[in-house]
Structure formats: structure tokens, C-alpha cells
Amino acid sequence: MSAKKLLDDYVTDIQLQLSEGNFDLALKEIQNALISYPTNSKLYINGGNIYKILGDIDNAELYFTKALSIHKSKEVLNNLSVIHIERRNYDQAISLAREAIEIDPAYVDAMYNLALSQDSLGNYDEAEKYSSKACSLNDYKDSRYLVLLIRILQNTCNWKDIDEISKILDQHVGDGVEHPFLSISRTDSEEVNFKVACSWEKRDIQRDNDAKKFNKKIKLGYLCGEFRNHPTYHLIKNLFKHHDQSNLEVYIFSYIHNDAEKEYIEDNVYKFVNINDIDNEKASELIKGYDLDILIDLAILITNNRQDVINNDSAKKIISYLGYPGSSGSKIYDYILTDQIVTPISQQKYYTEKFLYMPRTYQVNDGERIYLNKKLTNKKDHGLPEKSIILSCFNQSFKIDNLMLNCWIDILNETQDTYLWLLEDNEISKNNIYSYAEKSGIDSNRIIFAPRVNRSDHLDRLKLSDITLDTRIYNGHTTTTDSVQCAVPVVTLMGNHFASRVSSSILQAVGLDELITENISDYKSLVIKLTKDSTYLDEIKNKLREENQYLKDFYDLKKFTKELENNLNKIAN
């Protein structure tokens, strides 16, 4: 009869297999060890960790749960909390993280997971409490905690310490933890944005730049998960029907869509392919089978993207467009569809993608002049004073920063009968804005929050605004187009990176360069001038209603699509 293998020998063999990356063999050793040592919680923990690395969270949960039944530890509770976060079971994740913190009140990893779960549920007060505590206990060294805290502070318009924390995060640029979207929303430094994007890209990709023969009829694919009530859909929904079907075969590869929007798009393309229910590897193989010449990714780095579907075999040329205003930092994209306002040629060094310029604004719109709609609404219906000048901003709260809100408050202080009309994003941001205003001597009645409503109702009420006030670091994009289409002037401050120059691009395209400013002082002066000079304000509004060439071109989707196709033909040839 052979002697029982010692636990230490099993542990040595497990560690050897792990050091060589042999996860399957390590798991076999663990399973063999558990036959002899079925009550050893560390074996289950090691097994759970390996399954988690392999992406098998079902077995990971099974092993961690077994370990917990043998010995209750903060680490296992936290590991289970992470699994429930991945499954979006945030209430369960919160419960497990709280148990871990009861064992160790200074356990920062559990505090982070608790904050992350609360943030995902929109419980920003609890999220801020625990993310702040995690940062403090960690001496602000872990960029994961910093990233979460800044995101929460942005969403709640709590700017007390945000500049200082942002400077600390700048020291971690390049560690691959900060998401590029957070970077472009907190700083307009293209250099910083680019470093963050490049460090976020984990795949080692080298594109084959050899010339490849295109199909006689160009096969053009779009990858998109936004055919639903989403800004991308609202902008691009009417483009597809204008593609030249005699020279193009247009394919849509869609995930996360609503039936009505799917049906509308499907009627205007060669083939609509639903990849929602298949994993990235299978979706990638599916796309490869269509032998695409060009693939345009409409999501890139935004929430719910499927960037991992794209690889070297997806298409002969791959383009980034519309969804993400900046460089992806990935070499998988050959081009970014852009314009000379949002990305001057001097900024090419901060992009992995080559610039593919549209002649006017890069941003497509649905071609509809909203202000022509006849539906009647009035200020009283929306809690707005009848005799008033309404200064609106319907951007999400994360786009508002302290410098811009102070500017808006100064404008209210220096003008009469003006009211600030903002989107009610969340209760905490609303209360924080009220608090900032009151400390500056502004009656809170002069700041009016509008609830979220369906798009049609929103556009009807938007026409009641006199001036749209743009945000600074991250402009309005779809919201700026909405204002233009409702004949509401937009005052913007042109920044240094893509996201802070989009409104300038749109205003230039509609012939309203005079609404583009270059510093906060000029921005403030222009808004005050418009509020006090009704003749000038009416003149600007009329420019958005008249039949001039700028507006004809802006709303001419057929022309926009032709110009897009000209760029695609350049690539093909």
C-alpha cells in the first residue's frame, strides 16, 4: 500500500505547475489533494483563484463557498463579493463585502468592492464614503481606489478634493488601471489621454499594412450595440439608407438592440447580423466569414463595447467612429473618422489611428430640423418662469466641473431674469449644485432641474431654452446637435482634446463660429451679451432657422454619406 502523499508535497507540486502556467495540471493536483485533505480550506481557495483566472466563475464560486464553509475568512468573503460584482448581483456583493469588513474594519479591498457595488446601484453617498475611506487607509497609493473615487465625485458634482486627487492619479498614468473614458472626462491633455489609452490596451496587436485587394463591391460592416434609446442611434439612424447600394454591401453586426430600432435599421442595409447571444470568439469568427473590406466600430471604448470581437482578420481596414471621442490606444484600428476641428493634424502623434477627415463636422446627425415640429409646450408646463431667459445644459452631471459651474453662477449674479435649467441626473449632484449656488448668493429657485423624459418630449421642451451652455472638458455631443436642431444657440469653450472640441466642430459646420470661445472669461462675456442683447440673440437664433448653405449641408444626410463613402473609396484605392 503506497504512503499517503504529504500536504506539503501537494502544495509544492501545485506551486510548480502554477509557476509554469499549467493551470489545468495545478487544478488536478488540487483535486487529488482534496481527496486526502477534504477539510483544507486553502486548497479550495487556490482552486477558486485558478478557476477565476480561467474565467470559470461558476466553479470559482463553488470552491470559494466550500472554503468559506470550512473557515470564514475576509479574503474568501471578498473573493465571493468580486464574483457577484461580475455577475452584477450587487446586493449580494455588498452583503459579502460588509461581512469581510466586520472581520477587519481596515480591509481596503472589501471597502473598494463595497463602494464599487454601491456606485453601480447609484447609491453614491455610500459609494463615496467607502471609496474615500479605502483611499485614505491606502494613503492614496492604489489607482483602482482613486479611479473609483474620482468617478463618484464627478457624478455627484462634489469637487472639494477632486483636483488634488486627480493630480495624484496623474502619477499613475501608464499603469493600465484608469479607463480612457475617465481620462478624457477629467483632463483635456491629449498627451495624458493617449498614455492612459495605450496602457489600457492589453492586446499586443500588429496590423498587417500590406495592400489587400478589396472586393469589387465593397463590403462595409458596422459593429454596434447602440440600436436602442442611445445617443449613437439617434445620430446615425438615418445614415444607412443613404449608402450607395450599387457600390456597397452594408452589414450590421449588432448586440444590445431593441426590436423597433433593429427593424428600422434592418430595412436599410444588405444584412443585419445579431451577435448579441454569442461570445466574442464565435462572433469574431462569424465576422471573419463575411470577408469584409472595411469594418467601422461605433462603440470602441464606451460601456458595453465588443472591442474584443475585432482582430486582424475582421476586415482589411478597421475604422473607429462616433462612439468614443479620442484615441483607442489600440493598433487594431487603422483610421479614426474625424475632422480638422476636433483633431488638428498637430495631434496625430497622440493617436494610434490615422486621421480620416470629413470635410465639415465628423459627427453625423439624423437630418431632422426639430424646431419645425408643431407640438406646443410652454414654460409653465416645465416649471419655468414665463418672463425669463432660460440658460440650459442637459449634459450628464459628470461633464460639469467646478470652473464651469462657478462661471454659470457668475452669469446668474450679473444678469436679471435668467434661470439655469439642468438635467436632474441624481439627487446628490442636484443638492451639491444647489449648495454651491446658495454659498455664492444665488437663490436656489433660479436653478431648475428637469427630469429625464423620452427623447421626443425632451426635444419639445428643449425649444423653450434661450441659450445652451456647453460643458468644458467633455462637451455636449448629441446634446449640442439637439440644441442646434431645436434652433437654440450653444455657447462653447474650445478645449485641447477631441471631447472638448466637438461643439466647436458642430458650430463651425452650421456657420456659427461666433459662439466658439477660447477661454472662460470670453465664454462668460458672450453668454451675458446674449442675455442682455435680445436683438443679437434673435439674430443668432434666426441663423439656425434660415435656409443658408451651412444648414443645408448640415442636414443633408445624402451628402454626408457620399463624403463618408469618398473616404472609404480612398482607403479601398
Protein language model annotation of sequence segments:
Residues 219-221, 392, 421, 491:
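Short, well-ordered beta-strand segments
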